[in-house]
C-alpha cells in the first residue's frame, strides 16, 4: 500500500484528527460491528461536512491520479461511502464518474454499476476507508466483468492491516491513500493528543488486530 506524498499524508491526518473523523482511544477501546475491540474509530463521512477537508480530499485524490496513472477514463466510487469522494475527484479531473453497488439492484434494470462505464475503459475505484480491502476489490471485479480494467484504487485512509496488503497484492491492483494509520498515530503523538506510551500501544494493533482485541 502506498502513500505518495508524505506532506499531504500528514496534513490529512491532522485534519482527520481535528474534525474528529478519527478517534483514538487505546485505554477504552471501541467495539466494532464485527465484535472486535479496537483503539481507533474512523468515520470519514464527517469529512463531507467540512469544506476545508473536502478541498484537501478533492485536490489530494486528483493529485494521486495525475502522479500515478497515465490514463484514467472513469472514476468510480463504491456505494455508498466512496460515492461523494469519487465525485470530488472526478470533478477536479474533469472525468466521468460512476458508482458500483455491493450487489445488483433487485428491481428495475438490476444494475450493479450506476452511471456509464464504457467497455474497455481504464477505471479508478475510490473508497473512503481500507481495512481488508474486500469491499472495493469486489466492486472492482464487477467493473472488470463488464469489460473494463481497474487500474488502481484510491482511498482516504488505510489501517495498513496485513490482510489488506495481501488482498491487494493477490488482486494485482495498486492502492494509493491520502494517509494511513502509522502516519496518523505519529501526528497524534507529535500534537500531544496521545502519550508516547499510548502511541506504542496503538502501534501494536495493526500488526494483529485480533490478538490486540483479545488482550483488551
Swiss-Prot record:
<comment type="function">
    <text>Catalyzes the transfer of a ribosyl phosphate group from 5-phosphoribose 1-diphosphate to orotate, leading to the formation of orotidine monophosphate (OMP).</text>
</comment>
<comment type="pathway">
    <text>Pyrimidine metabolism; UMP biosynthesis via de novo pathway; UMP from orotate: step 1/2.</text>
</comment>
<dbReference type="InterPro" id="IPR004467">
    <property type="entry name" value="Or_phspho_trans_dom"/>
</dbReference>
<keyword id="KW-0328">Glycosyltransferase</keyword>
<feature type="binding site">
    <location>
        <position position="107"/>
    </location>
    <ligand>
        <name>5-phospho-alpha-D-ribose 1-diphosphate</name>
    </ligand>
</feature>
<dbReference type="GO" id="GO:0019856">
    <property type="term" value="P:pyrimidine nucleobase biosynthetic process"/>
</dbReference>
<dbReference type="GO" id="GO:0000287">
    <property type="term" value="F:magnesium ion binding"/>
</dbReference>
<feature type="binding site">
    <location>
        <position position="131"/>
    </location>
    <ligand>
        <name>orotate</name>
    </ligand>
</feature>
<comment type="similarity">
    <text>Belongs to the purine/pyrimidine phosphoribosyltransferase family. PyrE subfamily.</text>
</comment>
<keyword id="KW-0665">Pyrimidine biosynthesis</keyword>
<feature type="binding site">
    <location>
        <position position="105"/>
    </location>
    <ligand>
        <name>5-phospho-alpha-D-ribose 1-diphosphate</name>
    </ligand>
</feature>
<keyword id="KW-0460">Magnesium</keyword>
<dbReference type="InterPro" id="IPR029057">
    <property type="entry name" value="PRTase-like"/>
</dbReference>
<dbReference type="InterPro" id="IPR000836">
    <property type="entry name" value="PRibTrfase_dom"/>
</dbReference>
<dbReference type="Pfam" id="PF00156">
    <property type="entry name" value="Pribosyltran"/>
</dbReference>
<comment type="subunit">
    <text>Homodimer.</text>
</comment>
<dbReference type="GO" id="GO:0004588">
    <property type="term" value="F:orotate phosphoribosyltransferase activity"/>
</dbReference>
<protein>
    <recommendedName>
        <fullName>Orotate phosphoribosyltransferase</fullName>
        <ecNumber>2.4.2.10</ecNumber>
    </recommendedName>
</protein>
<keyword id="KW-0808">Transferase</keyword>
<feature type="binding site" description="in other chain">
    <location>
        <begin position="127"/>
        <end position="135"/>
    </location>
    <ligand>
        <name>5-phospho-alpha-D-ribose 1-diphosphate</name>
    </ligand>
</feature>
<dbReference type="InterPro" id="IPR023031">
    <property type="entry name" value="OPRT"/>
</dbReference>
<dbReference type="GO" id="GO:0044205">
    <property type="term" value="P:'de novo' UMP biosynthetic process"/>
</dbReference>
<feature type="binding site">
    <location>
        <position position="101"/>
    </location>
    <ligand>
        <name>5-phospho-alpha-D-ribose 1-diphosphate</name>
    </ligand>
</feature>
Amino acid at each position: 500500500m502506498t502513500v505518495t506524498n508524505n506532506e499531504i499524508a500528514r496534513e490529512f491526518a491532522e485534519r482527520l484528527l481535528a474534525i474528529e473523523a478519527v478517534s483514538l482511544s487505546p485505554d477504552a477501546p471501541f467495539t466494532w460491528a464485527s465484535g472486535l475491540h479496537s483503539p481507533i474509530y474512523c468515520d470519514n463521512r464527517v469529512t463531507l461536512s467540512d469544506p476545508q477537508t473536502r478541498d484537501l480530499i478533492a485536490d489530494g485524490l486528483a493529485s494521486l491520479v495525475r502522479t500515478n496513472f497515465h490514463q484514467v477514463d472513469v472514476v468510480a466510487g463504491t456505494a455508498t461511502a466512496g460515492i461523494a469522494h469519487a465525485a470530488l475527484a472526478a470533478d477536479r479531473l474533469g472525468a466521468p464518474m460512476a458508482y458500483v453497488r455491493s450487489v445488483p439492484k433487485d428491481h428495475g434494470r438490476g444494475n450493479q454499476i450506476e452511471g456509464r462505464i464504457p467497455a474497455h475503459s481504464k477505471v479508478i475505484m475510490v473508497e473512503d476507508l481500507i481495512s481488508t480491502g474486500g469491499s472495493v476489490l469486489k466492486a472492482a471485479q464487477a467493473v472488470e466483468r463488464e469489460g473494463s480494467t481497474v487500474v488502481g484504487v484510491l482511498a482516504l485512509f488505510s489501517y495498513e492491516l496485513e490482510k489488506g496488503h495481501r488482498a491487494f497484492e493477490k488482486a494485482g491492483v495498486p492502492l494509493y491513500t491520502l494517509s494511513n494509520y502509522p502516519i496518523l498515530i505519529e501526528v497524534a503523538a507529535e500534537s500531544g493528543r496521545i502519550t508516547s506510551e499510548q502511541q506504542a500501544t496503538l502501534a501494536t494493533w495493526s500488526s494483529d488486530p485480533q490478538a490486540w482485541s483479545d488482550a483488551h
